[in-house]
Amino acid sequence: MAARDDAEARAAQREREVADLTTQVSFLQEELTALRRKLTESPRQARVLEERLHEVQANLAAVTGQNERLVATLKEARDQIVALKEEVDRLAQPPSGFGVFLESREDGTVEVFTGGRKLRVNVSPAVEVDSLKRGQEVMLNEALNVVEALGFEELGEIVMLKELLEDGRRALVISHADEERVVKLAESLVGQPIRAGDSLLLEPRSGYVYERIPKSEVEELVLEEVPDISYEEIGGLMRQIEQIRDAIELPYLHADLFREHKLRPPKGVLLYGPPGCGKTLIAKAVANSLAKQVAEKTGQSGKSFFLNIKGPELLNKYVGETERHIRLVFQRAREKASEGTPVIVFFDEMDSIFRTRGSGVSSDVENTIVPQLLSEIDGVEGLENVIVIGASNREDMIDPAILRPGRLDVKIKIERPDAEAAKDIFSKYLIEDLPLHPEDLAEHGGSRGGTISGMIQRVVERMYTESEENRFLEVTYANGDKEVLYFKDFNSGAMIQNIVDRSKKMAIKQFLESGQKGLRIQHLLAACVDEFSENEDLPNTTNPDDWARISGKKGERIVYIRTLVTGKQGTEAGRSIDTVANTGQYL
Protein backbone atom coordinates (compact mmCIF):
# COMPACT_ATOMS: atom_id res chain seq x y z
CA MET A 1 0.00 0.00 0.00
CA ALA A 2 2.65 2.19 0.89
CA ALA A 3 4.64 1.08 -2.10
CA ARG A 4 1.80 1.93 -4.37
CA ASP A 5 1.43 5.33 -2.97
CA ASP A 6 5.06 5.88 -3.35
CA ALA A 7 4.95 4.76 -6.96
CA GLU A 8 2.02 7.00 -7.68
CA ALA A 9 3.81 9.86 -6.11
CA ARG A 10 6.84 9.26 -8.24
CA ALA A 11 4.67 8.85 -11.32
CA ALA A 12 2.96 12.13 -10.56
CA GLN A 13 6.36 13.68 -10.02
CA ARG A 14 7.56 12.45 -13.37
CA GLU A 15 4.43 13.71 -15.05
CA ARG A 16 5.03 17.12 -13.58
CA GLU A 17 8.65 17.02 -14.72
CA VAL A 18 7.57 15.87 -18.16
CA ALA A 19 5.05 18.68 -18.25
CA ASP A 20 7.73 21.16 -17.19
CA LEU A 21 10.12 19.84 -19.76
CA THR A 22 7.42 19.95 -22.37
CA THR A 23 6.73 23.53 -21.40
CA GLN A 24 10.44 24.36 -21.59
CA VAL A 25 10.75 22.62 -24.93
CA SER A 26 7.83 24.66 -26.22
CA PHE A 27 9.37 27.85 -24.84
CA LEU A 28 12.71 26.99 -26.34
CA GLN A 29 11.06 26.21 -29.62
CA GLU A 30 9.36 29.60 -29.51
CA GLU A 31 12.67 31.22 -28.58
CA LEU A 32 14.32 29.35 -31.40
CA THR A 33 11.64 30.49 -33.79
CA ALA A 34 12.02 34.09 -32.53
CA LEU A 35 15.78 33.91 -32.87
CA ARG A 36 15.46 32.49 -36.34
CA ARG A 37 13.10 35.35 -37.23
CA LYS A 38 15.46 37.96 -35.69
CA LEU A 39 18.37 36.38 -37.50
CA THR A 40 16.46 36.71 -40.72
CA GLU A 41 15.60 40.37 -40.01
CA SER A 42 19.06 41.47 -38.64
CA PRO A 43 20.68 42.58 -42.04
CA ARG A 44 17.81 44.93 -42.75
CA GLN A 45 18.04 46.41 -39.25
CA ALA A 46 21.80 46.80 -39.66
CA ARG A 47 21.24 48.76 -42.85
CA VAL A 48 18.66 50.91 -41.12
CA LEU A 49 21.04 51.56 -38.23
CA GLU A 50 23.86 52.46 -40.63
CA GLU A 51 21.59 54.87 -42.46
CA ARG A 52 20.57 56.45 -39.17
CA LEU A 53 24.26 56.66 -38.20
CA HIS A 54 25.15 58.47 -41.45
CA GLU A 55 22.23 60.81 -41.00
CA VAL A 56 23.27 61.62 -37.45
CA GLN A 57 26.89 62.23 -38.60
CA ALA A 58 25.71 64.59 -41.37
CA ASN A 59 23.55 66.46 -38.91
CA LEU A 60 26.50 66.67 -36.55
CA ALA A 61 28.78 68.10 -39.30
CA ALA A 62 26.17 70.68 -40.26
CA VAL A 63 25.71 71.71 -36.66
CA THR A 64 29.51 71.92 -36.20
CA GLY A 65 29.92 74.16 -39.30
CA GLN A 66 27.08 76.37 -38.19
CA ASN A 67 28.63 76.61 -34.77
CA GLU A 68 31.99 77.65 -36.27
CA ARG A 69 30.30 80.30 -38.39
CA LEU A 70 28.53 81.61 -35.36
CA VAL A 71 31.82 81.74 -33.47
CA ALA A 72 33.48 83.66 -36.34
CA THR A 73 30.53 86.01 -36.60
CA LEU A 74 30.63 86.65 -32.88
CA LYS A 75 34.39 87.29 -33.03
CA GLU A 76 34.00 89.69 -35.95
CA ALA A 77 31.17 91.45 -34.19
CA ARG A 78 33.31 91.74 -31.07
CA ASP A 79 36.22 93.20 -33.11
CA GLN A 80 33.88 95.67 -34.78
CA ILE A 81 32.51 96.69 -31.44
CA VAL A 82 36.05 97.24 -30.13
CA ALA A 83 37.01 99.24 -33.25
CA LEU A 84 33.86 101.31 -33.05
CA LYS A 85 34.53 101.95 -29.40
CA GLU A 86 38.07 103.07 -30.20
CA GLU A 87 36.74 105.28 -33.01
CA VAL A 88 34.16 106.78 -30.69
CA ASP A 89 36.83 107.36 -28.05
CA ARG A 90 39.14 108.91 -30.65
CA LEU A 91 36.42 111.17 -32.03
CA ALA A 92 35.50 112.18 -28.53
CA GLN A 93 39.04 113.37 -27.80
CA PRO A 94 39.67 117.13 -27.90
CA PRO A 95 41.62 118.50 -30.92
CA SER A 96 45.43 118.77 -30.82
CA GLY A 97 47.10 122.01 -31.76
CA PHE A 98 50.41 122.76 -33.41
CA GLY A 99 53.04 125.28 -32.49
CA VAL A 100 56.61 126.31 -33.20
CA PHE A 101 59.31 125.67 -30.60
CA LEU A 102 61.16 128.85 -29.66
CA GLU A 103 63.44 127.99 -26.74
CA SER A 104 63.64 125.98 -23.52
CA ARG A 105 63.78 127.27 -19.93
CA GLU A 106 65.80 126.07 -16.95
CA ASP A 107 62.69 124.88 -15.08
CA GLY A 108 61.87 122.33 -17.81
CA THR A 109 59.21 124.43 -19.53
CA VAL A 110 59.48 125.59 -23.11
CA GLU A 111 58.32 128.61 -25.07
CA VAL A 112 56.21 127.97 -28.16
CA PHE A 113 54.43 130.13 -30.69
CA THR A 114 50.87 129.08 -31.50
CA GLY A 115 47.73 130.82 -32.59
CA GLY A 116 49.51 134.16 -32.89
CA ARG A 117 50.59 133.97 -29.24
CA LYS A 118 53.85 133.23 -27.49
CA LEU A 119 53.24 130.76 -24.64
CA ARG A 120 55.32 129.05 -21.97
CA VAL A 121 54.08 125.47 -21.58
CA ASN A 122 55.05 122.14 -20.02
CA VAL A 123 56.49 119.18 -21.89
CA SER A 124 55.32 115.57 -21.81
CA PRO A 125 57.80 113.11 -20.24
CA ALA A 126 57.80 111.26 -23.56
CA VAL A 127 59.47 114.25 -25.27
CA GLU A 128 63.14 115.06 -24.66
CA VAL A 129 63.50 118.80 -24.24
CA ASP A 130 67.17 118.74 -25.26
CA SER A 131 66.26 117.24 -28.64
CA LEU A 132 63.95 120.12 -29.58
CA LYS A 133 65.38 122.59 -32.09
CA ARG A 134 64.45 126.21 -32.66
CA GLY A 135 61.83 126.54 -35.34
CA GLN A 136 60.77 122.91 -35.02
CA GLU A 137 57.06 122.15 -35.17
CA VAL A 138 55.53 120.52 -32.05
CA MET A 139 52.12 119.04 -31.24
CA LEU A 140 50.12 120.42 -28.31
CA ASN A 141 47.31 118.75 -26.34
CA GLU A 142 44.13 120.43 -25.10
CA ALA A 143 46.07 121.92 -22.20
CA LEU A 144 48.58 123.37 -24.73
CA ASN A 145 51.39 121.19 -23.44
CA VAL A 146 53.96 119.69 -25.81
CA VAL A 147 53.21 116.01 -26.39
CA GLU A 148 55.13 115.26 -29.60
CA ALA A 149 58.04 116.68 -31.62
CA LEU A 150 57.54 116.99 -35.37
CA GLY A 151 59.67 118.19 -38.29
CA PHE A 152 60.25 121.62 -39.80
CA GLU A 153 57.71 123.58 -41.80
CA GLU A 154 57.79 122.85 -45.53
CA LEU A 155 55.37 125.51 -46.79
CA GLY A 156 55.54 129.28 -46.66
CA GLU A 157 56.56 132.39 -48.56
CA ILE A 158 59.70 132.95 -50.61
CA VAL A 159 61.85 135.88 -49.49
CA MET A 160 65.27 137.06 -50.57
CA LEU A 161 68.11 137.33 -48.08
CA LYS A 162 69.58 140.82 -47.91
CA GLU A 163 72.09 140.28 -45.12
CA LEU A 164 72.80 138.27 -41.98
CA LEU A 165 72.77 140.16 -38.70
CA GLU A 166 75.72 140.11 -36.33
CA ASP A 167 74.34 137.48 -33.94
CA GLY A 168 74.19 134.95 -36.78
CA ARG A 169 70.69 133.86 -35.78
CA ARG A 170 68.71 136.63 -37.41
CA ALA A 171 68.60 137.94 -40.94
CA LEU A 172 67.24 140.86 -42.90
CA VAL A 173 65.08 139.68 -45.79
CA ILE A 174 63.07 141.31 -48.57
CA SER A 175 59.57 140.07 -49.32
CA HIS A 176 57.76 140.08 -52.66
CA ALA A 177 56.46 143.59 -51.99
CA ASP A 178 60.04 144.87 -51.38
CA GLU A 179 59.28 145.12 -47.67
CA GLU A 180 62.23 144.52 -45.37
CA ARG A 181 61.76 142.28 -42.35
CA VAL A 182 63.96 140.82 -39.64
CA VAL A 183 63.45 137.07 -39.24
CA LYS A 184 64.98 134.29 -37.18
CA LEU A 185 67.00 131.42 -38.62
CA ALA A 186 65.67 127.98 -37.79
CA GLU A 187 68.13 125.45 -36.43
CA SER A 188 68.21 123.81 -39.87
CA LEU A 189 69.73 127.00 -41.35
CA VAL A 190 72.15 128.03 -38.59
CA GLY A 191 75.69 127.48 -39.80
CA GLN A 192 74.63 126.80 -43.38
CA PRO A 193 76.45 128.68 -46.20
CA ILE A 194 73.78 131.21 -47.16
CA ARG A 195 74.54 134.51 -48.82
CA ALA A 196 72.85 137.67 -49.97
CA GLY A 197 70.55 137.07 -52.90
CA ASP A 198 69.57 133.55 -51.83
CA SER A 199 65.89 132.67 -51.74
CA LEU A 200 64.66 131.43 -48.34
CA LEU A 201 61.46 129.77 -47.15
CA LEU A 202 59.68 131.95 -44.56
CA GLU A 203 56.81 130.95 -42.27
CA PRO A 204 55.33 134.44 -41.83
CA ARG A 205 53.39 133.82 -38.61
CA SER A 206 56.30 132.60 -36.52
CA GLY A 207 58.92 134.67 -38.33
CA TYR A 208 61.29 131.74 -38.96
CA VAL A 209 63.10 130.94 -42.20
CA TYR A 210 63.61 127.22 -42.63
CA GLU A 211 65.56 126.37 -45.75
CA ARG A 212 67.41 127.75 -48.73
CA ILE A 213 65.59 127.29 -52.00
CA PRO A 214 68.18 125.67 -54.32
CA LYS A 215 67.73 128.06 -57.26
CA SER A 216 68.43 131.60 -56.13
CA GLU A 217 67.47 134.63 -58.14
CA VAL A 218 71.04 135.32 -59.17
CA GLU A 219 71.73 131.73 -60.20
CA GLU A 220 68.96 132.01 -62.77
CA LEU A 221 71.04 134.67 -64.51
CA VAL A 222 74.58 133.51 -63.75
CA LEU A 223 76.30 130.36 -64.94
CA GLU A 224 78.87 129.65 -62.24
CA GLU A 225 81.45 127.24 -63.58
CA VAL A 226 85.11 126.38 -63.82
CA PRO A 227 85.88 126.14 -67.56
CA ASP A 228 88.11 123.37 -68.86
CA ILE A 229 89.24 125.20 -72.01
CA SER A 230 92.94 126.03 -72.33
CA TYR A 231 94.78 128.45 -74.60
CA GLU A 232 96.26 125.48 -76.46
CA GLU A 233 92.78 124.59 -77.74
CA ILE A 234 92.37 128.00 -79.39
CA GLY A 235 93.86 128.43 -82.84
CA GLY A 236 94.82 131.49 -84.84
CA LEU A 237 94.60 133.99 -81.97
CA MET A 238 98.07 133.90 -80.44
CA ARG A 239 98.52 137.69 -80.54
CA GLN A 240 95.14 138.31 -78.88
CA ILE A 241 95.82 135.60 -76.28
CA GLU A 242 99.13 137.26 -75.41
CA GLN A 243 97.36 140.60 -75.02
CA ILE A 244 94.70 139.25 -72.68
CA ARG A 245 97.25 137.31 -70.63
CA ASP A 246 99.28 140.50 -70.19
CA ALA A 247 96.15 142.36 -69.15
CA ILE A 248 94.69 139.81 -66.74
CA GLU A 249 97.23 137.21 -65.60
CA LEU A 250 100.26 139.43 -65.05
CA PRO A 251 98.58 141.78 -62.52
CA TYR A 252 97.26 138.81 -60.54
CA LEU A 253 100.38 136.64 -60.58
CA HIS A 254 102.87 139.50 -60.08
CA ALA A 255 100.91 141.89 -57.92
CA ASP A 256 104.06 142.88 -55.99
CA LEU A 257 105.74 144.12 -59.16
CA PHE A 258 102.67 146.13 -60.10
CA ARG A 259 102.62 147.71 -56.65
CA GLU A 260 106.34 148.43 -56.84
CA HIS A 261 105.90 150.22 -60.16
CA LYS A 262 102.69 151.87 -58.90
CA LEU A 263 100.86 150.41 -61.87
CA ARG A 264 97.13 149.96 -61.53
CA PRO A 265 95.88 146.69 -63.06
CA PRO A 266 93.10 147.01 -65.62
CA LYS A 267 89.56 146.64 -64.34
CA GLY A 268 88.13 145.08 -67.44
CA VAL A 269 88.68 143.87 -70.97
CA LEU A 270 86.49 144.27 -74.05
CA LEU A 271 86.69 141.57 -76.71
CA TYR A 272 85.08 142.75 -79.91
CA GLY A 273 84.89 141.44 -83.43
CA PRO A 274 82.74 139.41 -85.83
CA PRO A 275 80.67 136.44 -84.64
CA GLY A 276 82.23 133.00 -84.32
CA CYS A 277 85.86 134.14 -84.02
CA GLY A 278 86.57 133.05 -80.44
CA LYS A 279 85.60 135.88 -78.08
CA THR A 280 83.70 133.64 -75.64
CA LEU A 281 86.32 130.91 -76.02
CA ILE A 282 89.14 133.23 -74.96
CA ALA A 283 87.17 134.48 -71.96
CA LYS A 284 86.64 130.90 -70.75
CA ALA A 285 90.29 130.03 -71.26
CA VAL A 286 91.33 132.96 -69.05
CA ALA A 287 89.60 131.47 -65.99
CA ASN A 288 91.16 128.06 -66.59
CA SER A 289 94.63 129.54 -67.08
CA LEU A 290 94.30 131.64 -63.93
CA ALA A 291 93.43 128.55 -61.91
CA LYS A 292 96.53 126.73 -63.17
CA GLN A 293 98.75 129.73 -62.48
CA VAL A 294 97.39 130.00 -58.94
CA ALA A 295 98.07 126.31 -58.37
CA GLU A 296 101.67 126.69 -59.53
CA LYS A 297 102.18 129.78 -57.41
CA THR A 298 100.62 128.54 -54.16
CA GLY A 299 101.21 124.82 -54.51
CA GLN A 300 97.55 124.14 -53.83
CA SER A 301 94.76 123.03 -56.12
CA GLY A 302 93.77 126.12 -58.06
CA LYS A 303 90.20 127.11 -58.67
CA SER A 304 88.67 130.03 -60.51
CA PHE A 305 85.12 131.06 -61.28
CA PHE A 306 83.63 132.18 -64.55
CA LEU A 307 80.36 134.06 -64.05
CA ASN A 308 78.73 133.94 -67.47
CA ILE A 309 76.00 136.57 -67.44
CA LYS A 310 73.05 135.84 -69.69
CA GLY A 311 72.78 139.41 -70.86
CA PRO A 312 69.25 139.70 -72.30
CA GLU A 313 67.81 137.80 -69.33
CA LEU A 314 68.97 140.59 -67.03
CA LEU A 315 66.28 142.79 -68.50
CA ASN A 316 63.08 142.90 -66.48
CA LYS A 317 59.82 144.71 -67.10
CA TYR A 318 59.77 146.10 -63.54
CA VAL A 319 61.63 149.33 -62.94
CA GLY A 320 64.82 148.81 -60.95
CA GLU A 321 64.88 145.00 -61.21
CA THR A 322 67.63 144.90 -63.85
CA GLU A 323 69.81 147.20 -61.78
CA ARG A 324 69.23 145.02 -58.71
CA HIS A 325 70.28 141.93 -60.67
CA ILE A 326 73.50 143.64 -61.70
CA ARG A 327 74.21 144.52 -58.06
CA LEU A 328 73.64 140.90 -57.04
CA VAL A 329 75.97 139.64 -59.75
CA PHE A 330 78.83 141.81 -58.52
CA GLN A 331 78.02 140.98 -54.92
CA ARG A 332 78.40 137.29 -55.81
CA ALA A 333 81.71 138.07 -57.51
CA ARG A 334 82.99 139.92 -54.43
CA GLU A 335 82.09 136.98 -52.20
CA LYS A 336 84.08 134.58 -54.36
CA ALA A 337 86.99 137.00 -54.72
CA SER A 338 87.20 137.59 -50.96
CA GLU A 339 88.22 133.93 -50.61
CA GLY A 340 91.32 134.59 -52.73
CA THR A 341 89.74 133.02 -55.80
CA PRO A 342 90.09 134.82 -59.15
CA VAL A 343 86.65 135.64 -60.53
CA ILE A 344 85.81 136.60 -64.10
CA VAL A 345 82.50 138.37 -64.71
CA PHE A 346 81.77 137.80 -68.39
CA PHE A 347 79.08 139.80 -70.20
CA ASP A 348 78.39 138.18 -73.56
CA GLU A 349 76.61 140.26 -76.20
CA MET A 350 77.35 143.34 -74.13
CA ASP A 351 75.77 145.68 -76.66
CA SER A 352 72.35 144.14 -76.00
CA ILE A 353 72.05 145.57 -72.49
CA PHE A 354 74.61 148.39 -72.19
CA ARG A 355 73.78 150.45 -75.24
CA THR A 356 74.63 154.12 -75.61
CA ARG A 357 72.31 156.15 -73.43
CA GLY A 358 69.69 158.03 -75.41
CA SER A 359 69.78 155.60 -78.34
CA GLY A 360 66.68 153.67 -77.23
CA VAL A 361 63.50 153.93 -79.27
CA SER A 362 60.91 153.75 -76.48
CA SER A 363 61.92 152.63 -73.00
CA ASP A 364 65.42 154.16 -72.66
CA VAL A 365 66.08 151.47 -70.08
CA GLU A 366 69.82 151.85 -70.70
CA ASN A 367 69.67 155.26 -69.00
CA THR A 368 69.66 153.50 -65.61
CA ILE A 369 71.33 150.17 -66.45
CA VAL A 370 74.55 151.73 -67.73
CA PRO A 371 75.12 153.91 -64.62
CA GLN A 372 74.58 150.86 -62.42
CA LEU A 373 77.30 148.94 -64.25
CA LEU A 374 79.60 151.96 -64.12
CA SER A 375 79.21 152.22 -60.35
CA GLU A 376 79.90 148.49 -59.94
CA ILE A 377 83.01 148.62 -62.11
CA ASP A 378 84.27 151.64 -60.20
CA GLY A 379 83.52 149.71 -57.00
CA VAL A 380 85.86 146.95 -58.12
CA GLU A 381 88.78 149.39 -57.88
CA GLY A 382 89.66 148.46 -54.32
CA LEU A 383 88.78 144.80 -54.72
CA GLU A 384 91.27 142.21 -55.88
CA ASN A 385 90.74 139.13 -58.02
CA VAL A 386 87.71 140.43 -59.97
CA ILE A 387 88.01 140.91 -63.73
CA VAL A 388 85.20 142.17 -65.96
CA ILE A 389 85.26 140.88 -69.54
CA GLY A 390 82.78 142.04 -72.15
CA ALA A 391 82.21 140.59 -75.61
CA SER A 392 80.34 142.25 -78.44
CA ASN A 393 79.84 142.20 -82.20
CA ARG A 394 78.88 145.89 -82.17
CA GLU A 395 81.28 147.73 -79.93
CA ASP A 396 80.12 150.99 -81.53
CA MET A 397 76.73 150.57 -79.80
CA ILE A 398 78.15 150.23 -76.27
CA ASP A 399 77.97 153.35 -74.13
CA PRO A 400 81.29 155.26 -74.35
CA ALA A 401 81.42 155.71 -70.57
CA ILE A 402 81.90 151.96 -70.21
CA LEU A 403 84.71 151.85 -72.76
CA ARG A 404 86.75 154.75 -71.42
CA PRO A 405 90.12 154.09 -69.73
CA GLY A 406 89.66 153.24 -66.08
CA ARG A 407 86.72 150.91 -66.70
CA LEU A 408 87.16 148.53 -69.62
CA ASP A 409 90.78 149.57 -70.05
CA VAL A 410 91.94 146.95 -72.53
CA LYS A 411 90.18 146.55 -75.87
CA ILE A 412 91.18 143.55 -77.95
CA LYS A 413 89.87 143.03 -81.46
CA ILE A 414 89.25 139.40 -82.39
CA GLU A 415 89.65 139.49 -86.15
CA ARG A 416 88.60 136.99 -88.76
CA PRO A 417 91.33 134.40 -89.38
CA ASP A 418 93.70 134.82 -92.31
CA ALA A 419 95.18 131.85 -94.15
CA GLU A 420 97.85 131.15 -91.52
CA ALA A 421 95.35 131.45 -88.67
CA ALA A 422 92.96 129.16 -90.54
CA LYS A 423 95.70 126.51 -90.80
CA ASP A 424 96.23 126.78 -87.05
CA ILE A 425 92.49 126.40 -86.39
CA PHE A 426 92.23 123.41 -88.73
CA SER A 427 95.12 121.76 -86.88
CA LYS A 428 93.04 121.83 -83.67
CA TYR A 429 90.30 119.73 -85.26
CA LEU A 430 92.25 117.62 -87.79
CA ILE A 431 94.57 115.55 -85.63
CA GLU A 432 96.69 112.52 -86.44
CA ASP A 433 94.62 109.97 -84.54
CA LEU A 434 91.63 110.49 -86.86
CA PRO A 435 90.92 107.61 -89.28
CA LEU A 436 92.47 108.58 -92.64
CA HIS A 437 91.77 107.00 -96.01
CA PRO A 438 94.53 104.62 -97.23
CA GLU A 439 94.78 106.35 -100.62
CA ASP A 440 95.41 109.74 -99.03
CA LEU A 441 97.99 108.17 -96.72
CA ALA A 442 99.70 106.54 -99.70
CA GLU A 443 100.02 109.92 -101.45
CA HIS A 444 102.11 111.16 -98.53
CA GLY A 445 104.25 108.07 -98.03
CA GLY A 446 102.13 106.70 -95.19
CA SER A 447 102.87 109.68 -92.94
CA ARG A 448 99.82 110.63 -90.93
CA GLY A 449 101.27 114.02 -90.04
CA GLY A 450 102.12 114.72 -93.67
CA THR A 451 98.63 113.68 -94.76
CA ILE A 452 96.98 116.01 -92.24
CA SER A 453 99.25 118.89 -93.28
CA GLY A 454 98.47 118.28 -96.94
CA MET A 455 94.74 118.23 -96.26
CA ILE A 456 94.92 121.49 -94.33
CA GLN A 457 97.00 123.15 -97.05
CA ARG A 458 94.57 122.11 -99.80
CA VAL A 459 91.39 123.17 -98.02
CA VAL A 460 92.87 126.52 -96.92
CA GLU A 461 93.93 127.25 -100.50
CA ARG A 462 90.39 126.43 -101.61
CA MET A 463 88.91 128.79 -99.04
CA TYR A 464 91.26 131.74 -99.48
CA THR A 465 91.81 131.81 -103.24
CA GLU A 466 90.33 134.92 -104.84
CA SER A 467 88.79 132.94 -107.66
CA GLU A 468 85.49 133.26 -109.46
CA GLU A 469 83.95 130.41 -107.49
CA ASN A 470 84.85 132.07 -104.20
CA ARG A 471 83.18 135.38 -104.96
CA PHE A 472 80.41 136.09 -102.46
CA LEU A 473 79.12 139.67 -102.49
CA GLU A 474 79.37 142.92 -104.34
CA VAL A 475 78.82 145.84 -101.98
CA THR A 476 78.03 149.39 -103.00
CA TYR A 477 79.19 152.19 -100.72
CA ALA A 478 77.49 155.51 -100.13
CA ASN A 479 80.06 157.29 -102.33
CA GLY A 480 79.25 154.99 -105.26
CA ASP A 481 82.34 152.78 -105.05
CA LYS A 482 81.86 149.04 -105.41
CA GLU A 483 83.87 146.18 -103.95
CA VAL A 484 83.78 142.43 -104.44
CA LEU A 485 84.00 140.42 -101.23
CA TYR A 486 85.05 136.77 -101.12
CA PHE A 487 84.09 134.00 -98.74
CA LYS A 488 87.47 134.38 -97.05
CA ASP A 489 86.36 137.84 -95.93
CA PHE A 490 83.63 136.19 -93.82
CA ASN A 491 85.51 133.15 -92.59
CA SER A 492 85.53 132.37 -88.86
CA GLY A 493 86.69 129.72 -86.45
CA ALA A 494 83.12 128.51 -86.08
CA MET A 495 82.85 128.07 -89.86
CA ILE A 496 86.11 126.09 -89.94
CA GLN A 497 84.86 123.80 -87.18
CA ASN A 498 81.63 123.29 -89.09
CA ILE A 499 83.56 122.39 -92.27
CA VAL A 500 85.57 119.76 -90.38
CA ASP A 501 82.40 118.33 -88.80
CA ARG A 502 80.74 118.12 -92.23
CA SER A 503 83.73 116.27 -93.69
CA LYS A 504 83.75 113.78 -90.82
CA LYS A 505 80.06 113.08 -91.35
CA MET A 506 80.74 112.52 -95.07
CA ALA A 507 83.49 110.03 -94.19
CA ILE A 508 81.12 108.14 -91.90
CA LYS A 509 78.42 107.99 -94.59
CA GLN A 510 80.96 106.76 -97.16
CA PHE A 511 82.06 103.99 -94.80
CA LEU A 512 78.46 102.90 -94.24
CA GLU A 513 77.78 102.85 -97.99
CA SER A 514 81.02 101.40 -99.40
CA GLY A 515 82.91 100.00 -96.43
CA GLN A 516 85.92 102.31 -97.08
CA LYS A 517 86.90 103.97 -93.82
CA GLY A 518 88.85 107.17 -93.48
CA LEU A 519 88.74 110.92 -94.00
CA ARG A 520 89.73 112.21 -97.44
CA ILE A 521 90.68 115.58 -98.84
CA GLN A 522 87.63 115.33 -101.11
CA HIS A 523 85.44 115.29 -98.01
CA LEU A 524 86.98 118.55 -96.78
CA LEU A 525 86.69 120.25 -100.16
CA ALA A 526 83.06 119.13 -100.57
CA ALA A 527 82.27 120.29 -97.03
CA CYS A 528 83.82 123.67 -97.86
CA VAL A 529 81.59 124.03 -100.93
CA ASP A 530 78.50 123.02 -98.94
CA GLU A 531 79.31 125.51 -96.21
CA PHE A 532 79.72 128.33 -98.73
CA SER A 533 76.46 127.36 -100.44
CA GLU A 534 74.51 127.41 -97.19
CA ASN A 535 75.92 130.83 -96.29
CA GLU A 536 74.82 132.32 -99.57
CA ASP A 537 71.46 133.60 -98.23
CA LEU A 538 72.59 134.60 -94.74
CA PRO A 539 73.32 138.32 -95.28
CA ASN A 540 69.61 139.05 -95.51
CA THR A 541 69.01 142.03 -93.27
CA THR A 542 67.02 144.92 -94.66
CA ASN A 543 69.71 147.26 -93.34
CA PRO A 544 72.96 146.40 -95.18
CA ASP A 545 75.05 148.80 -93.12
CA ASP A 546 73.99 147.17 -89.82
CA TRP A 547 74.72 143.74 -91.26
CA ALA A 548 78.16 144.88 -92.41
CA ARG A 549 79.03 146.25 -88.97
CA ILE A 550 78.02 143.01 -87.25
CA SER A 551 80.07 141.05 -89.79
CA GLY A 552 83.12 143.16 -89.03
CA LYS A 553 83.13 145.46 -92.06
CA LYS A 554 83.85 149.00 -90.95
CA GLY A 555 84.40 152.18 -92.90
CA GLU A 556 82.25 153.73 -95.60
CA ARG A 557 78.53 153.16 -95.20
CA ILE A 558 77.16 150.31 -97.35
CA VAL A 559 73.90 151.03 -99.14
CA TYR A 560 73.46 148.03 -101.44
CA ILE A 561 74.51 144.38 -101.50
CA ARG A 562 74.44 141.98 -104.44
CA THR A 563 75.21 138.27 -104.14
CA LEU A 564 77.78 136.73 -106.49
CA VAL A 565 77.51 133.03 -105.76
CA THR A 566 78.31 130.08 -108.01
CA GLY A 567 76.33 127.43 -106.18
CA LYS A 568 75.17 123.94 -106.91
CA GLN A 569 72.52 125.24 -109.31
CA GLY A 570 74.78 127.62 -111.24
CA THR A 571 75.54 131.30 -111.01
CA GLU A 572 72.71 133.31 -109.56
CA ALA A 573 71.82 136.78 -110.70
CA GLY A 574 72.66 139.61 -108.39
CA ARG A 575 69.88 140.74 -106.10
CA SER A 576 69.22 143.42 -103.61
CA ILE A 577 69.43 142.31 -100.05
CA ASP A 578 66.05 143.94 -99.48
CA THR A 579 64.29 141.34 -101.63
CA VAL A 580 65.38 138.38 -99.55
CA ALA A 581 63.04 137.01 -96.87
CA ASN A 582 64.21 138.12 -93.46
CA THR A 583 65.00 135.03 -91.39
CA GLY A 584 66.93 136.96 -88.77
CA GLN A 585 70.31 135.24 -89.32
CA TYR A 586 73.69 136.84 -89.77
CA LEU A 587 76.81 135.51 -91.39
UniProtKB/Swiss-Prot annotation:
The keyword Translocase does not apply. GO terms for cellular component: proteasome complex. SUPFAM superfamilies: P-loop containing nucleoside triphosphate hydrolases. The gene is arc. GO terms for biological process: modification-dependent protein catabolic process; proteasomal protein catabolic process. Residues 1-94 form a coiled coil. NCBIfam families: pup_AAA. It comes from the Bacteria. PANTHER family: AAA-FAMILY ATPASE, PROTEASOME-ASSOCIATED ATPASE. ATP binds at G276, C277, G278, K279, T280, L281. The keyword Ribosomal protein does not apply. PROSITE patterns: AAA. InterPro entries: AAA+_ATPase (IPR003593), AAA_ATPase_domain (IPR050168), ATPase_AAA_core (IPR003959), ATPase_AAA_CS (IPR003960), NA-bd_OB-fold (IPR012340), P-loop_NTPase (IPR027417), Prot_ATP_ID_OB_2nd (IPR032501), Prot_ATP_ID_OB_N (IPR041626). Consists of three main regions, an N-terminal coiled-coil domain that binds to protein Pup and functions as a docking station, an interdomain involved in ARC hexamerization, and a C-terminal ATPase domain of the AAA type. One of its GO terms (molecular function) is ATP hydrolysis activity. ATPase which is responsible for recognizing, binding, unfolding and translocation of pupylated proteins into the bacterial 20S proteasome core particle. May be essential for opening the gate of the 20S proteasome via an interaction with its C-terminus, thereby allowing substrate entry and access to the site of proteolysis. Thus, the C-termini of the proteasomal ATPase may function like a 'key in a lock' to induce gate opening and therefore regulate proteolysis. This is Proteasome-associated ATPase. Signal peptide: none annotated. Residues 586-587 are annotated as: Docks into pockets in the proteasome alpha-ring. Homohexamer. Assembles into a hexameric ring structure that caps the 20S proteasome core. Strongly interacts with the prokaryotic ubiquitin-like protein Pup through a hydrophobic interface; the interacting region of ARC lies in its N-terminal coiled-coil domain. There is one Pup binding site per ARC hexamer ring. Upon ATP-binding, the C-terminus of ARC interacts with the alpha-rings of the proteasome core, possibly by binding to the intersubunit pockets. Gene3D superfamilies: 1.20.5.170, Nucleic acid-binding proteins, P-loop containing nucleotide triphosphate hydrolases. Belongs to the AAA ATPase family.
